[in-house]
């Protein structure tokens, strides 16, 4: 399973990229707004850091305007993937962009039915939201399992990006189920690096090393 980072903070992206653990980035209007910078400038800077798919989301809700925005965004860099909301208008835009060989990531997926429709429309990626489902008492991991099964049975080539990741357990479970990708906040990537027994082990090694004579 590939790991993307879910952020628009270029410092976080650099740190994750320097660790060699990510191969793509997902952003959205909320993440861009947190940075307080020009949208296209941020996206361009991200493409300079990570050599992989960079998802940038359209703002329009009408399909013709989505297509227009998408055509402008892909001019920024060859790695740009257009994030499209899972709506009827969004599916129309995905169909057109797919015919133009512009990659799309259909976002705000909360059911297997939505994922199937997005794939049929020609989406390159679908992004089911685990954490938000968990927040309302539903099972986000179960959704990933359903989509993985359907895509395998139907030989669908659309890749699954597990999104709205809240902790390391989400990442591990998605990997076990066969999700192609998980897009992970920086803080969760940091959490994945840590374990109390690792810290204890390092402390013990250092203490033992201090007792070694003639180092």
Swiss-Prot record:
- Report if keyword Transferase is assigned: yes
Predominant subcellular localization, coarse grouping: cytoplasm
One Gene Ontology term of the biological-process aspect is: pentose-phosphate shunt
Pathway field: Carbohydrate degradation; pentose phosphate pathway; D-glyceraldehyde 3-phosphate and beta-D-fructose 6-phosphate from D-ribose 5-phosphate and D-xylulose 5-phosphate (non-oxidative stage): step 2/3
What's the Enzyme Commission number for this chain?
Answer: 2.2.1.2
The molecular function terms in GO held by this entry are: aldehyde-lyase activity; transaldolase activity
**Entry GO terms, CC:** cytoplasm
User: Between which residues do disulfide bridges form?
Assistant: none
Where can this protein be found? Answer: Cytoplasm
- Where in this chain does the entry annotate a coiled-coil region? none
According to the UniProt record, what class of enzyme is this?
A: transferase
Provide the function of this protein: Transaldolase is important for the balance of metabolites in the pentose-phosphate pathway.
Can you say what this protein is called? Probable transaldolase
Q: Which organism is it from?
A: Clostridium kluyveri (strain ATCC 8527 / DSM 555 / NBRC 12016 / NCIMB 10680 / K1)
Q: Which gene encodes it?
A: tal
